[in-house]
């Protein structure tokens, strides 16, 4: 199996606006998904011509509101739109939709047969916008009506362990399939699609990201430049930033830039969870050998460490954990970084006629800081 494809979701009001986005990003993606449910009603009547307006394969999707989409016109109207979009197949298959997304409960034999006859591959999808899907292997097998269909499961995880299960189950699914955990906690499933054997990962351009904010897709920049999605393989070293809720962080930018600069096959990404044990189980399964630790886990992570550096023992907090010989070892690089910066800025100096080293200042600073944190709590 090759690397997962990058599919950009198109959610503009008009076909013309969607075409412009395809032209802008076509060198960074492999295919697009036309979300007909986002189009103006007048525009929906002309979706048949869209594949001939672009130079990339296209998925036809008309997502119902119950599945997280905008279409609320009823199944008869939606079926008519599907039929209209797939009709009059062109002998040049590049001018037809390459894929069509049918939900697992959408069973209209005439339209399904037409899609197969025209060479349009069916993605058979199941969406749960409020809960995880537990029986992923069984669900994928039951949705695959023919050998040409691609089962797709997208769900909203309740905790990181649901995402871990997605990776575990993904390895067991036979044939092409698409797996995606939505929302901030599910982001690793989009970045690391290789590790779930997913056929593709969905992204959205920054111009329309607001339209899919609830499911939290990646942007073309994030998938290509920040996480270097196309180069991720089973051999890529994985590292993460453990925290909650991690609304905004520059750590992936800093670390991944460093990996690229020094030619390292590595990827650093956010691991969002309020439960430390879930993160460690996630890391164990994906063979993540190091994590930065930030709020609120710098103290709670101590319980799970097999060893602690002297700095961690003295300060009572940990900001870095490394796995060696199947044991998690905790370090605190905040103290070292502060000490180094202080030495460079002022060196050793005299206070009240006593020479005080930067090391002593750092020790007192972090001890006072930790006490302050406890008092505020």
Where are these regions (language model features)?
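Active-site beta->alpha loop and helix N-cap motifs at the rims of alpha/beta catalytic domains
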Residues: 1-124, 129-133
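Active-site glycine-rich loop that binds ribose-phosphate moieties when present
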Residues: 80, 84, 135-140, 337-349, ...
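Catalytic alpha/beta core domains of metabolic enzymes, predominantly
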Residues: 90, 104-237
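Phosphate/diphosphate ligand-binding glycine-rich loop within oxidoreductases
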Residues: 236-348
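Glycine-rich phosphate/diphosphate-binding loop of Rossmann-like nucleotide-binding domains
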Residues: 349-377
């Amino acid at each position: 199996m090759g690397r997962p494809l990058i599919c950009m979701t198109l959610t503009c009001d008009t076909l013309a606006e969607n075409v412009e986005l395809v032209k802008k990003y076509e060198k960074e993606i492999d295919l697009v998904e036309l979300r007909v449910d986002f189009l103006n009603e007048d525009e929906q009547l002309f979706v048949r011509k869209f594949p001939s307006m672009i130079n990339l394969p296209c998925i036809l999707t008309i997502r119902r509101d119950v599945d997280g989409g905008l279409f609320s016109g009823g199944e008869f109207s939606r079926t008519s739109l599907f039929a209209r979009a797939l009709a009059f197949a062109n002998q040049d298959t590049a001018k037809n939709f390459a894929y069509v997304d049918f939900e697992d409960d959408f069973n209209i034999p005439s339209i399904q047969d037409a899609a197969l006859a025209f060479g349009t591959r069916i993605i058979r999808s199941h969406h749960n916008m409020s809960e995880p899907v537990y029986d992923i292997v069984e669900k994928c097998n039951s949705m695959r009506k023919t050998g040409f269909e691609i089962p797709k499961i997208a769900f909203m995880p309740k905790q990181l362990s649901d995402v871990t299960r997605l990776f575990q189950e993904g390895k067991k699914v036979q044939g092409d399939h698409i797996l995606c955990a939505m929302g901030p906690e599910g982001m690793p499933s989009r970045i690391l699609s290789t590790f779930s054997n997913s056929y593709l990962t969905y992204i959205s351009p920054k111009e329309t990201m607001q339209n899919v904010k609830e499911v939290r897709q990646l942007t073309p920049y994030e998938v290509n430049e920040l996480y270097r999605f196309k180069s991720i393989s089973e051999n890529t070293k994985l590292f993460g930033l453990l925290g909650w809720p991690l609304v905004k962080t520059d750590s992936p930018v800093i670390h991944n830039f460093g990996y690229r600069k020094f030619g390292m096959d590595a990827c650093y990404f956010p691991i969002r969870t309020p439960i430390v044990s879930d993160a460690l189980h996630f890391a164990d399964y994906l063979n993540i050998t190091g994590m930065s630790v930030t709020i609120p886990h710098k103290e709670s992570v101590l319980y799970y460490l097999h060893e602690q550096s002297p700095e961690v023992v003295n300060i009572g907090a940990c900001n870095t954990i490394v796995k060696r010989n199947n044991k998690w070892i905790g370090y605190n690089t905040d103290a070292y970084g502060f000490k180094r910066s202080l030495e460079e800025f002022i060196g050793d100096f005299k206070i009240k006629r006593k020479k005080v080293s930067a090391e002593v200042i750092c020790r007192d600073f972090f001890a006072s800081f930790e006490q302050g944190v406890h008092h505020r709590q």
